[in-house]
């Protein structure tokens, strides 16, 4: 799909560009988790280095946040196209689309970097077994040898910002679209 959108000039629209970014995220999700999981399955070695765990956590968190922000962008583009069709070209210029995508990647990377740096610098107990098939922040927090309630609060805040608010924004966007179609 990414190649098709890149090659066909008729598909050089904001929504198609956002769809290609979403496809890129899906490809990266697979390459973040599956290779290590497949290696563990084939070789029976279920360990990962501390650095490898940090890298996997960083990319997984980045992709999750970027996906949520891109879905908001897609909802916005859809809402503008349906509710304000005459303003679409003004509100959805190529520059605006590139800014939405770039902003999503930058915000996702900053959020993931903050969580990954913190999670890699807390003291861990001697037992470092994660009962999970990949490294992510909640699984690693359970291994900490310190009180992590403040950090867990920031994880909850981050999850609220990047999961609950996007869900509400997307729902409102669809509500606005349905209202416009109804009228």
Locations of the language-model features?
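Transmembrane helical core of 7TM receptor-like proteins
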Residues: 1-183
